[in-house]
Design a protein with these regions (language model features):
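Extended alpha-helical coiled-coil "stalk/arm" regions that scaffold and mediate dimerization/assembly
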Residues: 123, 127-135
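N-terminal leader/propeptide and maturation segments of large enzyme subunits in energy/redox metabolism
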Residues: 153-158, 163-166
Length: 166
């Protein structure tokens, strides 16, 4: 229940693996949905399934338990501050840079997220998240479909060419 778009794409047989990512360390954040090893001819169906699934989520609402679980998980990670092999200070500095680059007055905003998590928790039953989907995903005119298609044997050909030169 936590990944309806992913599940819809998998159920439709698009790609061997489907995942999403969000990059917000830039002035214009970017959200992407990736279907690995998908058939190039499924581009239209890929977009259609995503749009239909998002429209259904906006209309019927997101699973509130999944939203709460996601927020709780984010809060747990924030409070634990377990970054594995990476020093906390280094990662805190990198988090500060993500906001500091674009607003000199708020370098610590990413380190002070408990109020934001509480706000998100309070919005679960209000349609807030569905409105975000509508505004930033469905009504966004700045989308693109990018196909990265490998050329079979390209590395082998480059290696042979390099051997000839050497």
């Amino acid at each position: 229940p936590g990944a309806p778009v992913r599940q819809a794409l998998i159920d439709a047989g698009i790609g061997e693996d489907v995942y999403g990512s969000f990059e917000d360390g830039m002035l214009q954040p970017m959200f992407s949905i990736v279907a690995k090893n998908a058939d190039e001819s499924d581009q239209t169906r890929f977009v259609q399934i995503i749009e239909e699934t998002l429209q259904k989520l906006v209309k019927e609402g997101l699973n509130q338990d999944s939203l709460l679980a996601g927020i709780n998980s984010a809060e747990f990670r924030f409070r634990e501050a377990d970054y594995g092999q990476f020093p906390k200070g280094l990662l805190y500095g990198l988090q500060c840079m993500e906001s500091w680059l674009f607003d000199d007055t708020k370098p610590f905003i990413h380190l002070e997220c408990l109020d934001t998590l509480q706000f998100l928790r309070e919005q679960i039953k209000t349609g807030y998240f569905e409105d975000l989907i509508q505004k930033y995903l469905l009504d966004n005119a700045h989308g693109a479909v990018v196909v990265v298609a490998p050329e079979k044997g390209l590395n082998r050909a480059k290696e042979q060419e390099k051997k000839k030169k050497l």
